A protein has these predicted regions:
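Conformational coupling and interaction surfaces
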Residues: 1-4, 8-11, 15-132
């Protein structure tokens, strides 16, 4: 973790940042159906297969995937948001969120239940390109 860089980004980024916190991806488990697919040469499937071999029988928590989903599709209709300010508060990288209607950042708030989000995200992960 590069805490100084994180602090600089949080303080100086010129536009709002949408934060997908620990609590968002922590309960969204994905990958279980993906690794059972009958496809070859899938880097996503291969990576998840390795993770499952290391002890994630119910799927992987999906922090990064929720951030990607929102970056590509937007937070509606999946999440509500709360405006506020994100801060890196110490040299170990601990951070805080302060709700503030005039803050420059947004934080995702659960709207669609985690189980439904897992199905949605995993369906995107399982998508195969159409041959032309």
């Amino acid at each position: 973790c590069d805490t100084p860089a994180s602090r600089v980004v949080a303080e100086r980024w010129p536009t709002e940042i949408i934060f997908s916190g620990f609590e968002i991806g922590n309960m969204i488990f994905t990958g279980k159906k993906l690794v059972q697919m009958d496809v070859k040469d899938s880097p996503v499937k291969d990576a998840y297969s390795l993770c499952f071999a290391e002890g994630d029988p119910n799927g992987r928590m999906s922090w990064d995937l929720t951030a990607v989903l929102v970056a590509v599709k937007g937070y509606e209709p999946y999440y509500n948001v709360e405006r506020g300010t994100f801060r890196v508060v110490n040299d170990e990288g601990a951070n805080s969120w302060t709700p503030d209607g005039k803050g420059k950042d947004l934080r995702l708030i659960e709207k669609v239940p985690a189980v439904e989000m897992a199905v949605l995200i995993e369906n995107y992960m399982m998508h195969q390109p159409v041959s032309k």
